[in-house]
A protein has these predicted regions:
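A short, structured surface patch at a secondary-structure boundary
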Residues: 73-133, 183
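Intracellular leaflet-associated regions of eukaryotic membrane-associated proteins
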Residues: 116, 143-146, 205
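Acyl-group handling in specialized metabolite and lipid biosynthesis
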Residues: 169-171
C-alpha cells in the first residue's frame, strides 16, 4: 500500500469520526438501552500478512446469542430490532473507522476474516468496504433460503471464490482516486439502493441458490464434484 493511500485513509477516517461523533454517541446509547450488553462488539480478526487485531462494530445481536453460526442471514433470531436497522444501512460498521485510524484497516479492501480461516496471506490491509462488499450487499437476504446446515458449504463453494476474485481484481489497480469512487458508491448504495454490479451479482446469486436447492433437495445428499464445478461456473 502506498504511503499516500495510507495517509488519505487516516485523514478521511479522522474526518468522518469527528463529523459523526454526535451520531455515534446516540447509536451507542440506543444500542445499550435496546438490549442488555455493551454498545460495541469486539472480535479478533486477521489483517495484512495475518497480523491480528481487534475489530469494532456496534453490537447488533443479543449477547447471549452471539456465539452462534458465523454466517448471518435475514430474519436471524439473534439480531435485535435496533441491530436489524443498523445492519440494513451498514451503520454497525461505523466504529471501524477507528480501526482505520489505528492502521489495522483501510477504507477500501477485502473484508477482514477470522484468524482460523484459510488463505489469509493478504498483501493488503482489509477494508470497511470494497467491490465484493457492495456486490453482495443483499447476501443475507438471499442466503435465508439456504438451510442452516448447508450455509457453510454453500458459502465456501459459491460465494467466497467470487468475492476473492472481485477484491483481488480491484486491489491490483487500486489508487486513492478509485478508493474515493468506491466510498461514493458505498454511500450511494446505502442511501439509494444497489447499483448495476450489485443487481447483477444478486441475480447470479439467486440462480446459484435455486441450483443448489435443486441439487440438495434430498437432505442427505451433497453436491458431487461435477455439480460443484457447474455451480462454480455460474
Amino acid at each position: 500500500m502506498s504511503r499516500t493511500r495510507s495517509c488519505l485513509d487516516r485523514v478521511v477516517a479522522a474526518t468522518i469520526l469527528l463529523v459523526l461523533l454526535p451520531a455515534l454517541l446516540v447509536i451507542m446509547l440506543v444500542v445499550r438501552l435496546s438490549s442488555p450488553g455493551p454498545a460495541l462488539f469486539r472480535q479478533r480478526r486477521a489483517g495484512r500478512n495475518r497480523d491480528e487485531f481487534i475489530l469494532y462494530k456496534f453490537r447488533s445481536m443479543r449477547c447471549e446469542d452471539s456465539a452462534g453460526p458465523a454466517i448471518t442471514v435475514s430474519g436471524d433470531c439473534r439480531i435485535t430490532g435496533v441491530g436489524a436497522f443498523l445492519r440494513r444501512y451498514k451503520l454497525d460498521e461505523l466504529p471501524q473507522f477507528w480501526n482505520v485510524m489505528r492502521g489495522n484497516m483501510s477504507l477500501v479492501g477485502p473484508r477482514p476474516k477470522l484468524p482460523h480461516h484459510e488463505g489469509l496471506d493478504l498483501p493488503y490491509r482489509p477494508g470497511i468496504t470494497g467491490v465484493a462488499t457492495l456486490a453482495f450487499r443483499d447476501e443475507e437476504k438471499i442466503l435465508a433460503a439456504i438451510p442452516r446446515v448447508q450455509l457453510d458449504a454453500f458459502y465456501e463453494i459459491c460465494i467466497k471464490p467470487r468475492k476473492a476474485q472481485l477484491d483481488l481484481e480491484y486491489m491490483h489497480s487500486a489508487t486513492p482516486m478509485s478508493d474515493l469512487k468506491q466510498l461514493w458508491r458505498t454511500c450511494s448504495s446505502c442511501l439509494f439502493g444497489p447499483d448495476e454490479l450489485a443487481v447483477r451479482e444478486s441475480e447470479r446469486l439467486n440462480l446459484l441458490v435455486a441450483a443448489w436447492l435443486e441439487i440438495t433437495r434430498d437432505a442427505d445428499e451433497s453436491p458431487s464434484e461435477v455439480e460443484i464445478d457447474c455451480l462454480k461456473s455460474f
